[in-house]
């Protein structure tokens, strides 16, 4: 493997911590020698992933109407059918416009904490700062009322926003210290055909932004893709038949990003399919060159024995890969965050030893 990402582990994004400082300190202590980049844990409002975009980006836009609110008694959606529904305001004379992306403000602020901890020696020198950014279909998942009419307009506005905000992100974080991960869950489910509110064109909703957005990121920045089936409210939102869809998406992303793709992360199966050769067999069709592949086969329920089973099955079809959780693991109810992270690190390190 001659690419820039060669580490054993990828932290997908969210961590079970209460603050950025706590996440960065724990991440550095427990995983520092296993990683090429460290995320800020996506704590606070960002723990809801694209719920953050629904509430902080889309809802405040004066040209967006709220068609319906969540029916959840707590006011917090419990699943995808309980999220607020949005529609572009009728009679909008011009294109939709988003002024700024609050997630970029958070990333720049978190980098300040990252840099301070690195200067103190808490974070190992050489680790990049990892920023996860949702792809358009995921960020704009609330436009359900008239998806066919509204989504293309919202997508253009969002892509314009991303182009402007990537410039601002790079003004705040040195390119050589940055790793950007495009996060996709709704895109994957859209291609699988399980989102009832979407329309024709699922593949293009993934492929178009790959070719339009990723080339805007300078080569000095490391870039990866996280391909996932979602954890809202539980893993997985939809159980895939096999790795075929994610392999096709990974191949396309690497071939059409207009620049180096340093890594791809592909979520794995449930534990009962740890030795299901049919699930893993499409890995033989991966054509990603030096791009580092991380398989999301670390599960919190069956420890090193389960990871070894899945690793052995995957190794029948793929020679060299790193591992990760199937998604971020900042939203595991009832689990002690520090212990969850400690167990995660122990399981991955145990993979170094012979079975």
What is the role of each PLM region?
Residues 206-290:
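Aromatic-lined glycan-binding groove of carbohydrate-active enzymes
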Residues 76-174, 179-205:
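Active-site-proximal, glycine-rich beta->alpha crossover segments in alpha/beta enzymes
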Residues 27-29, 113-128, 170-177, 211-220, ...:
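Acidic (Asp/Glu)-rich catalytic clusters
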Residues 20-21, 101-117, 151-166, 199-213, ...:
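Well-ordered, non-membrane alpha-helical segments in soluble/globular domains
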Residues 137-148, 183-199, 224-239, 265-269, ...:
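Active-site-proximal beta-alpha loop/turn segments in soluble metabolic enzymes
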Residues 1-77, 350:
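N-terminal basic, low-complexity leaders that serve as flexible interaction/assembly modules and, when applicable
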Residues 255-355:
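Catalytic-face loop-and-helix region of soluble metabolic enzyme cores
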Residues 2-12, 33-38, 126-132, 177-181, ...:
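Structural preference for beta-strand elements that scaffold enzyme active sites
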